[in-house]
From Swiss-Prot:
InterPro entries: BRCT_dom (IPR001357), BRCT_dom_sf (IPR036420), DisA/LigA_HHH (IPR041663), DNA_ligase (IPR001679), DNA_ligase_AS (IPR018239), DNA_ligase_CS (IPR033136), DNAligase_adenylation (IPR013839), DNAligase_N (IPR013840). The gene is ligA. It comes from Streptococcus uberis (strain ATCC BAA-854 / 0140J). Its EC number is 6.5.1.2. NAD(+) binds at D29, Q30, E31, Y32, D33, S78, L79, E107, R130, E164, K278, K302. HAMAP family: DNA_ligase_A. This is DNA ligase.
Length: 652
């Protein structure tokens, strides 16, 4: 083994020299990675033979065994999207109803990967991906390879900042040319290339792919008065900040800026997919607050999707985890928004009928939300003798009759034993936002299901090395990795489990809200629908769905089986104390507080069980008003909402 380690060390150092110094690599990234992983595996097993000049020991590169989860100290919210001027005007009206003199700042929406950087005493200590907004991946070593991200700030401060890592168009073209010459699959677009690069385990690959960044937010408490100050502060600290922006109180000015940027976007050296409009004043931002998903003080205008013509060659009908049958068109390949597209969703049978879509039609294809290829309409002038689309009457997986339920647009398979439905449910359970079982993807699920090794999610936890090795193409090392991932998933917070169960209408955020309130899946099973419905952000639809799911004996049995197999049923995040003095109340803070900061007041209220929101409505239970309270206090009084002062809060 010592001889092989020496050989690999020498060979890889030669390849590194070719790449970094000579700019003339003789092997592909794929071949380099393969040899690199062989070396690192051997070095782990025989550490006594590690060479001093091993690439794994070099400053320029580091092999990572994987990425640890990282709990963000401050949530990374997504933004509300807008696709029209009318939606921006509606946003403007909402903001101006609270702050008539509000000023906006418009910034470019960089098409890259969201990152969060934490510094202590000016030193970079953590770089992480966004993940689900609460938990991301720690990619610090890769972040350090982005040249314009400082390792040490110009000021010895402790701060968390947010921004976007991206790949320039020139770097993207250079990398794809190299991959083409090496016979490797090309990246679809710069965003995919940037995302794939930051998940590399070999940091030297990250270094040579020349990523860049733009920072735009101080996530930790800021001394700045407005967003413009934030950007100037970030630049003064040594970060790269995009200089193309506009400040105005007029949405007409903002729209003119959007139009100008859209006309010029092809001349930029990097990709953008829209414009982000924020309330400039940070105090106003705090007053406006957040919904369950996004800030009320910002909106992301997305540029209209690019459209291309393609011919429908055939249609596939597939079953989702809830039994919904989705038609997908197979197309003549086209280049669309930087990717090659050969399939596009047709949504549902009602959509096909409404648009009169037929096999053989020439259609207009676009990317819905700039992500999912979809058929927009038929090019009628190019229709010949195409026949109406044949609609399936039976499930393509289990041959059961399909149903078209009243008030639904989708065909649905309602056979609980449908193989496709079960497999999709298993895939969902193992997915990243659910139980995050790495290695248990669609291909492995299909093999396990076909071999009758798993029938429901509880069966996942009785898989063994011997049973996995009976599957074709599964080696001992990959089987053990899968078992380790399964074992690790047992300790997930129970909101991940709840989401993984695939209960209708219960998404990831609803799962977290439910478990924050009830503390465990077992407590939730015993909860009445009224106590569920009163949780802010949920309602009766989700409450009924939860009640109906746990009313089924097989659902209860599944939970008990998972518990017996060691799966955690408790919520591991911060729980809501249902006995707290203000539990269940929706509270709004307004005006200037004298003895407390607004953040201190917010934290005290939340610790007492209240939900603090940014705007007054009929759902508001209480308003705490400081001095110089304005329109929110007036609105509270007009609605008959109870109003208290700061002294009342201090005495609680």
């Amino acid at each position: 083994m010592e001889k092989r380690i020496r050989e690999l060390t020498s060979l890889l150092n030669q390849y590194r020299q070719e790449y970094y110094t000579n700019d003339n690599p003789s092997v592909s990234d794929q071949e380099y990675d393969k040899l690199y992983h062989e070396l690192i595996d051997l070095e782990k097993e025989y550490p006594e033979y590690i060479q001093k000049d091993s690439p794994s020991q070099a400053v320029g590169g580091l092999i990572l065994s994987g990425f640890e989860k990282y709990q963000h100290p401050f949530p990374l919210y997504s933004l509300q999207d807008a696709f029209s001027k009318e939606e921006l005007e509606a946003f403007d009206r909402r903001v101006k109803s609270e702050f008539p003199k509000a000023e906006y700042i418009a910034e470019l929406k960089i098409d890259g990967l969201s990152i969060s950087l934490s510094y202590e005493s000016g030193r970079l200590v953590t770089g992480a991906t966004r993940g689900d907004g609460s938990v991301g991946e720690n990619i610090t070593e890769n972040i350090k390879k982005i040249k314009d991200i400082p390792h040490q700030l110009k000021d010895d401060i402790t701060i968390t900042v947010r921004g976007e890592a991206y790949m320039s168009r020139s770097s993207f073209q250079k990398i794809n040319l190299e991959r083409q010459e090496n016979g490797e699959t090309e990246f679809a677009n710069p965003r995919n290339a940037a995302a794939g690069t930051l998940r590399q385990l070999d940091t030297s690959i990250v270094a040579r792919r020349e990523l860049a960044s733009f920072l735009y937010q101080e996530a930790s408490p800021s001394q700045a008065q407005n967003q413009e100050d934030v950007l100037e502060n970030l630049e003064a600290l040594g970060f790269s900040v995009n200089k193309k922006r506009l400040i105005s109180s007029s949405m007409e000015d903002i729209w003119s800026f959007i139009t100008q940027v859209e006309d010029e976007r092809d001349n930029l050296s990097y990709d953008i997919d829209g414009i982000v409009i924020k309330v400039n004043n940070l105090a106003m931002q705090e007053e406006l607050g957040f919904t369950i998903k996004a800030p009320r003080w910002a909106i992301a205008y997305k540029f209209p999707a690019e459209e291309k013509e393609a011919e429908i060659l055939s249609v596939d009908w597939t079953i989702g985890r809830t039994g919904v049958v989705t038609p997908t068109a197979n197309l003549t390949p086209i280049q669309l928004a930087g990717t090659t597209v050969s399939r596009a969703t047709l949504h549902n049978v009602d959509y096909i009928a409404e648009k009169d879509i037929r096999i053989g039609d020439t259609v207009i294809v676009y990317k819905a939300g700039d992500i999912i290829p979809a058929v927009l309409r038929v090019v009628d002038t190019k229709r010949d003798q195409q026949l109406p689309m044949p609609i399936p009457k039976v499930c393509p997986s289990c041959q059961s009759d399909l149903v078209h339920l009243e008030a639904e647009v989708a065909l649905r398979c309602i056979n609980p034993l449908c193989p496709s439905l079960i497999q999709r449910s298993l895939e969902h359970f193992a997915s990243r936002n659910a139980m995050n079982i790495a290695g248990l993807g669609p291909a492995i699920v299909e093999k396990l299901f076909s071999a009758q090794l798993i029938h429901d999610v509880a069966d996942i936890y009785q898989l063994s090395l011997d049973s996995l090795l009976t599957l074709e193409g599964i080696k001992e090392k990959s089987a053990q990795k899968l078992l380790d991932a399964i074992q690790s998933s047992k300790s997930n917070s129970a909101d991940k489990l709840l989401f993984g169960l695939g209960i209708r209408h219960v998404g990831a955020k609803a799962s977290r809200l439910l478990l924050e309130t009830f503390g465990s899946v077992e407590n939730l099973m015993k909860a009445d629908d009224q106590s569920i419905a009163q949780i802010d952000g949920l309602g009766h639809v989700i409450a009924n769905s939860i009640k109906n799911y746990f009313a089924k004996e097989e659902a209860k049995q599944l939970i008990f089986e998972l518990k017996d197999k060691g799966v955690n049923l408790d919520y591991l995040g911060k729980k809501v104390d249902t006995s707290a003095q203000l539990f269940g109340l929706t509270v709004v803070l307004t005006g200037k507080l004298e003895e407390m900061t607004r953040q201190e007041a917010k934290e005290k209220l939340e610790n007492m069980g209240a939900k603090v929101t940014g705007s007054v409505s009929k759902k508001t239970d209480l308003v705490i008003a400081g001095s110089d309270a304005g329109s929110k206090l007036d609105k509270a009084r007009s609605l008959g909402i109870d109003v208290k002062d700061e002294n009342w809060l201090l005495q609680l």
